Amino acid sequence: MKHELVLVIDFGGQYNQLIARRVRENNVYCEILPCTASIERIKEKNPKGIIFTGGPNSAYLEDSPTISKEIFELGVPILGICYGIQIMSHVLGGVVRKGNKQEKEYGKTAITYGKSSLFEGITTNSVWMSHTDLIEKVPEGFTIVANTNDCPVAAMENVERNLYGVQFHPEVEHCLEGDKILTNFLYNICKVKGDWTTDSFIEDKIKELKEKIGDKKALCALSGGVDSSVAAVLIHKAIGDNLTCIFVDHGLLRKNEGNDVERIFREKFDINLIRVNAEDRFLSKLKGVSEPEAKRKIIGEEFIRVFEEESNKLGKMDFLVQGTIYPDVIESGHGNAATIKSHHNVGGIPEDVDFQEIVEPLRELFKDEVRKIGLELGIEEGLIFRHPFPGPGLGIRVIGDVTKEKCDILREADAVYMDELRKAGLYREIWQAFATLPDVKTVGVMGDERTYAYLVGLRAVTSSDGMTSDWYKMPYDVLERISNRIINEVDGVNRVVYDITSKPPGTIEWE
């Protein structure tokens, strides 16, 4: 089934993916294209509506991103946001200029709305502004429909041509009733019906996969992460026993993670699963290696070798399943080419695996949509909402050289940490939390005796996408319980510290 489509035209704004997600939350399928996309390509997509994103440039400068005037002649409703309203105004003959110190607006701003179908049902008057330029004169045929004390054109429209623009950001949470404005644009102006749901996606995708793969064979590298897990179950729904999954257990997983993967996919979904216990092999390769990038490279390359060896035992495979999701496609060139994700985001495409074609069942989905699909498919919440885990696993959470002893210590400490977060009801509130084992020992006193044991670092952050993050303000009583349990229950640890570094300047992982 072909769904109604709204296009987001990206001018370099930081919220391009957020806008697309907001559209999809309205049950409308959405894709992102760069502002350099040709008019022919836009026409081929046959969109019901178009949204211009914000951007860091000034519309009146010659080298700034622009758009062909032809797009305004398509008869398709267009909504310009921030830079989007400015480039619309500039291209159509309005005047955009740099704002003076008083005219620059950042953060929550009081606004006065006029009559417009965009603002139907809006009862609040606070929006989120982030601009240094402003529209001094709107193009011919446009009407000003909102203003602030310092921004005379906070919104404009040309109803006859179905062109609309807002200077603020309705897509961000801080903009009161911004979701209503987007809904009004989609349903009142673009006249969409809202036919994009997880149910419809699953049904359409299974049908598509059956037609594409038929009775041929597919191979999937299963990590136990959300993306590869959902991809595997979706493919299995379509082709059943013609799917084989290889799960390379490199010995660098969290406590019980390998057993959980085996239980879920073998017992619950009855998927052909080959579990390869390669712990000794990986630890042998990592012996004495302490530099983070060297560890990453070793783990990535060794995974590829193990995967190739196991897949070659199976003979020819027609399809290789990849868990590529939509942000990967966007970041690789706005849909021109897909980023081929390797297992755990390490390594690359196996060179010696005999397959004809790659299949990416999730390439149209954002992460939150992948999770919804996973729940619809019956994958348990514990896996679907598990915190992000790096490809090299404990190999980069053990700081310095990696040994089995250190991995075992870290596994136990991390398990205690996660257990306490779940008991406190904080696990789902946190984007990512984990324990790390620095290559440091400290002096302590336990049972009236001097100890010299490892220090464990705790990390917890909040984020929407992992690009930036804030350290999580953990309640002191929870921290105290976690620290006491780790020191009392995990042999080889006598000190616990909590990392309060945001990103930037730090990264989320320590290595």
From Swiss-Prot:
Positions of the catalytic residues: C82, H169, E171
Residue span, GMPS ATP-PPase domain: 196-386
GO cellular component: cytosol
Catalyzed reactions per annotation: XMP + L-glutamine + ATP + H2O = GMP + L-glutamate + AMP + diphosphate + 2 H(+)
Pfam families: GATase, GMP_synt_C, NAD_synthase
Residues binding ATP, per UniProt: S223, G224, G225, V226, D227, S228, S229
GO molecular function: ATP binding; GMP synthase activity
Alphabetical keyword list: ATP-binding, Glutamine amidotransferase, GMP biosynthesis, Ligase, Nucleotide-binding, Purine biosynthesis
Pathway named in the protein's UniProt entry: Purine metabolism; GMP biosynthesis; GMP from XMP (L-Gln route): step 1/1
EC id: 6.3.5.2
Name of the protein in its database record: GMP synthase [glutamine-hydrolyzing]
Gene designation: guaA
